[in-house]
Amino acid sequence: MQFSGTVEIAAPRDRVWSFLMDPNEVGSCGPGVETIEVIDADHFKAKAKVGVGFISARFVVDMTVAERNEPELAVLKAHGQAPGSAVDATANRHLDGPAEGPTTMDWSADVTISGTLASVGARMIEGTANKMIGQTFDCIKAKLEAG
């Protein structure tokens, strides 16, 4: 599944970059995120509960910053496991705009879900994913714009 979008954030680009590269900050905005463990600057682990329709699963997700070009581009790769389900994702975030802001974030994600969770159907998964993505970016935007 492919997801993409653009978010306008009324904040300086370096502050947006710092927030987005801090797993604890981003994790605090992720629906269902229960814990974040920072292993080093490029590796972290999260536990998150995800529900789609009548199925819910608790994922353990390993994430890696695969590429970074501060303060413009970051590519993250993730692999998550839950009993009977798995998810793999690659996400790209590109920041643009004047240094003092506002900042435009273009993002995209390629996500593959397998196992029990995938059995509920792509349409239901996409609807849930779009809702969670929207909640995450609304939270990120609100926190950054609040200062």
Put a short name on every predicted segment:
Residues 12, 41, 70-71, 98-101:
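Short strand-connecting beta-turns/loops that link adjacent beta-strands
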Residues 138-147:
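Short, highly charged C-terminal tails/helix-capping segments
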Residues 5-7, 33-34, 60-67, 89-97:
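Hydrophobic/aromatic beta-strand elements that line small-molecule binding cavities or substrate pockets
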Residues 1-49, 146:
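Hydrophobic ligand-binding cavity/cleft-lining segments
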Residues 2-6, 43-45, 58-60, 73, ...:
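Intrinsic-disorder/low-complexity, polar/charged segments enriched in Ser/Thr/Lys/Arg/Asp/Glu/Gln
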Residues 37-82, 135:
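Glycine-rich portal/gate segments that line the openings of hydrophobic small-molecule binding cavities
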Residues 27, 123, 137-139:
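Long amphipathic alpha-helical segments used for membrane anchoring, targeting, substrate engagement
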Residues 75-130:
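Beta-strand/loop substructures that line and gate deep hydrophobic ligand-binding cavities in soluble
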